[in-house]
Amino acid sequence: MRGFSIRVRLFLKLWCTSFYSLLTIILIPIIGIIIYNSGTYTIDDLSSLIYEKTATIWFVFIIQWCFSVDLDSKFFNQLITYPVSKWRFLLERTLFSIIIFFSLAIIISLPLGFILGNFVWKGFVFTIPVYLALGGFVILGTMIGKHSLGGLIAGILFWMMILFGGALLRELNAILLIYGSVERVVSGESRFFLAENRWILINRLFYIGLGVICTIGAIFKINRKSA
């Protein structure tokens, strides 16, 4: 546990000292407030823009960065020769990316939630199943491609599918906050378990299941590779 906490601190230090992370923390809340004040977007439209369309590709780059630190170097090839649990290595790097992403997302959501209201936070929580699916897809792509570039390509393809494939996905569309019926569920005016909202619950469960399946597939892949 001590070794894990040290590695977490090292990863967070690497991330926090990068120009990209500081730029993201500063610019995203400012851009969100400017867009909202322009009168072009409502709160649900803005939440969809930030959490469903922008934060998803942002999460892809964070996961890719976390895995590239080890996977794109000779360290990983040396690591798998030691009698260690390879699935723990995989889940540890996944946990690092989750800690970084959610920490930054919370930091960004604080000013937006304070200015725009609680719907911003609720929209973020509602989108978490999509992040789980996207993360699992990126990790599986990384293991299949044996390089973080494989995960990056898989993540971009997944992001493009949810961004432009709404007509094809229909009720499995990942971008839902822009719809009035979903907005009412997220805001608490309606309930998940009502008959007319059951498709929304199935939609979220689908993405949770997809994330779990992809992560399990990645674990099998890394164990098979190192066997």
What are the roles of these predicted feature ranges?
Residues 28-36, 102-111, 156-167, 182-184:
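Aromatic-anchored segments of alpha-helical transmembrane domains
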Residues 35-46:
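Short, hydrophobic transmembrane alpha-helix segments
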Residues 65-99:
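Helix-loop-helix units of permease transmembrane domains in multi-pass membrane transporters
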Residues 154-227:
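Terminal transmembrane helical anchor/hairpin motif
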